[in-house]
Amino acid sequence: MRLVKKNVIINGIYEAGVRYPEPANISYLWNFGFFSLVCLIIQLVSGILLAMHYSAHVDLAFNSIERLVREVDFGWLLRYVHANGASFFFIVVYVHMLRGLYFGSYQKPNAMLWVSGVVIFLLLIITGFLGYVLPWGQMSYWAATVITNLVTVIPVVGEDIVIWLWGGFNVDNPTLNRFFSLHYLCPFIIVGLVGLHIIFLRENGSTNPLGVKSNVDQIPFTPYFTIKDLFSFMIFLVLFFAFVFFAPNYLGHPDNYLMADSNVTPAHIVPEWYLLPFYAMLRSIPNKVLGVLALVLAIVVLAFLPFLTISEVRSSYFRKIHKHLFWSFLALCFFLGFLGSQPAAAPYLTCGLYSTILYFVYILVLFPYIYMVEKVIIKSILKTNKK
């Protein structure tokens, strides 16, 4: 113990991983932050190994991945771990964020913790899109063409930015090189932001299901939460490798097993499943500028939740109306994801437009201000009980 106390690094690890106090009543939903870190490590390691075999050239990219899968020892494992790792990364991040919404973890004094998380989420989306292009399959190529074209809505400099992204006048070899470089860089930026996120977490400590301060009822991280994390980690690995070994392409798209062809347009251009709700918002609005604005604001607006919310009570555990709102909001998100996977035709576009409006009503109006309604109801109940 004396050696631990003397060494700054060892003592820091000891304090963070052994003695760090956590609320005694936190549930397994709080493990998804740990899962996010696990997924980030999986993606970093598998991505670096994949980059050793990848050729960022339009004539070689598709074949280099096929060669990796067919000829390199355990190359198939590398590819499917990385591909499914991205999907699982988004699953755990979505659950992590939804848990924050449900239990009010985004409210002050954790505002900066939430904002840093939204920034990480935005960077994850960018990284995921860049990686989706790299296999240079049919869906990769056309997704890159459609999404990069959206940058043209930026006034004055939009056209110039698109030409710079493309490295020419259409998606081609320079585009692939740029996307590969940025996709390789972004995870390391995310690592830095995760470090900042953890610093903000340590500043005020973890929240809990009741949404109240728990300075008294706390227990050390080890052994209680270490065992809890290890148990849930084993379950996570079982589920993850079940997809890797038995359904490696279930979360992918079959068109990406066809080499990119600029002369053949897929019948239905879609991004990865985890971006479908935002894609539904983008295409449901007829005006291109407003569609892109809705797409960006749908993510950015989440960062303003801590500053819009006026509730004195955090957790939905004590807020029945907020609880029902949360579950209806979750159903809306699933519905938007379904709409994003469907062809761009009626009635999907009409439903998408109304769902997009409803999404912003939830975030900007209902979640922040429903507390006023709850407060009036509580006061009326208290008055009735007094009588």
From Swiss-Prot:
Cofactor note: Binds 2 heme b groups non-covalently.
Binding site for heme b b562: 82, 183
Gene Ontology terms: biological process: mitochondrial electron transport, ubiquinol to cytochrome c
Subcellular location: Mitochondrion inner membrane
Residues annotated as signal peptide: none
Entry GO terms, CC: mitochondrial inner membrane; respiratory chain complex III
Gene3D superfamilies for this protein: Cytochrome Bc1 Complex, Chain C
Top-rank lineage group of the source organism: Eukaryota
Binding-site list for heme b b566: 96, 197
Membrane topology: Multi-pass membrane protein
Description of how the protein assembles with itself and partners: The main subunits of complex b-c1 are: cytochrome b, cytochrome c1 and the Rieske protein.
Protein family (similarity comment): Belongs to the cytochrome b family.
Other remarks on this protein: Heme 1 (or BL or b562) is low-potential and absorbs at about 562 nm, and heme 2 (or BH or b566) is high-potential and absorbs at about 566 nm.
Protein name (database record): Cytochrome b
Organism: Dictyostelium citrinum
Lineage: Eukaryota, Amoebozoa, Evosea, Eumycetozoa, Dictyostelia
